[in-house]
Amino acid sequence: MDYIKRFTTREGVRMSLAVTTDTVETARVRHDLWPVATAALGRAMTGAILLAGDFKNHENVSLRIKGDGPLGVVHVDAFSDNTVRGYVDEPHVDVPLKHAGKLDVGAAVGHNGEVQVTRFTQLAQDYTSTSPIQSGEVAEDLAYYLYASEQVPSTISLGVLVDPDYHTVVAGGFIVQALPDATDEALAQVEKNINELGPVTEYLKVHPDGKGLMERVLDGLTVNEVYNEPVNFQCRCGRDRFAGALMTLREDDKKAILEDETTELVCHYCNEKYHFSREELQDMFEPKGPVQ
């Protein structure tokens, strides 16, 4: 089962860790993603889940990665209940592999563009901030965003492994952040641990449940687990929402769609299809008099 865990340490370092294999696979199936699209969207979904709740507040986060690569825009919404949804503009993209047969997410996303993050919090006004894309590999781009926009030094590792049949083998990642009281010794120790760990997907291949990953990253520090909750793909769409959207159409547009026997609407985020018959729409669009 997918999850997110958060840890604090006595030495002033904190860590958020997520395993998202099933969540990413759900997105792959719903959107019929090709491998590099799965990797890009999976990294972005994992990163957004890690961003969606800090250690004090849980909030909704909207992440848009707008690169100049063939994938188009990567769209992700992560919610305070640890659910996430997302899509890419072009799910059927193929780019040449990098060395050792690695997926070239940077080429698919693009090396130029911007990362846009909107935080929806109950404690303050919603706000949006942007930062330039650094590599298109997602993790480096989010780390730069946190430093440039929120002044939080962070190390982020995100990974998605896809097999030759396009299925998601493992997916997950972590964020490690230094608090103002972090000691130089602790930061040096964590940097050493992360360098020795290598790519997070290599670890998850051996330990798909992520067990022991925190111990590897925070080895040598005094750790306290403060949060442990499940993660899953879930959309906020629904038939009632689409019906409400149809009601906002101009009269000319309403007449136009009534020319068809059935109207199909598709949610971008989850690819769910909603069908409305002509009779349903006629009833919906018919002016309703005041209740007597």
For the regions a language model picked out, list residue spans one by one:
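Interaction interfaces in information-processing and related assembly proteins
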Residues: 1-227
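Cys/His-clustered metal-coordination modules, chiefly Zn-binding fingers
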Residues: 195-292
